[in-house]
């Protein structure tokens, strides 16, 4: 299953055209990624643009599923699906180049995957977002928003702040508990 997530509560409330177009692009990216490792005709969207509530944010969620070809394994699926288009943009190779050029710091684990492979050839992966990394006693939290030609900078900034809220609160709470 590949999930396409985009937009915060502020943007989704009206399900504005920009958010729908951005989400559709991400669903198409997921379909394309899975079509490289799935049996022909099996890639389908099983859930489309449904609102789901997370701890501090609402997201539009779509599920894209397909049946794996016999000649591929879990590692092939991982290579096809990641880095996820939800964090890179499109076209993916050029978007990744631009991110390397434009972002002031390396992403580190942010935007990567966390998960496992088992001995039966299965895997379960999640995109590492809404998280904090602790390095040399300092917590690092990263967040972002999808930027497209018709993005509203103020709305994208607000979305980024909203997305960073949960991990920042977790870091602050952990710090308070450590001093208690």
Positions of PLM-derived features:
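Positively charged, low-complexity/disordered segments
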Residues: 1-7
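Extended alpha-helical targeting/anchoring segments
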Residues: 8-9, 13-180
